[in-house]
Amino acid sequence: MNDELRQEISEIASKFKLFECNTCALSIQEFLIQRGISEKKVKIYTGSAKGKYGNIYHDDLGQNIATNGRHEGIAVKIDGEELIFDNIHNEGIPKQEWLGKFYCLALDLGGEFEIAEMEF
């Protein structure tokens, strides 16, 4: 079941491009709810959506993945490991690794991402 679930979530997530994280997360969430699976949405926020402070840069891609200060994905426990699925990591990635992929200007100024988790 876990391999099948991961494959189905990956198929959903792979349909979305950069800057479509919200729609991607909603689609995955709806899929899981329809199957009676409770998980959570994980959101990161730079603290500002204005100008350069709203940019979220992805280290592996070498480019911005958000200009509104926000990005989100869905956390799913598979084989005891919490994986995040989003429009960039459609195969799923461990949560701490996912969080470590992002950069924003606030980090250089001593700030950090605001992280919110909402169960569904």
Placement of each model-derived feature along the sequence:
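A structural boundary/capping signal
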Residues: M1-F120
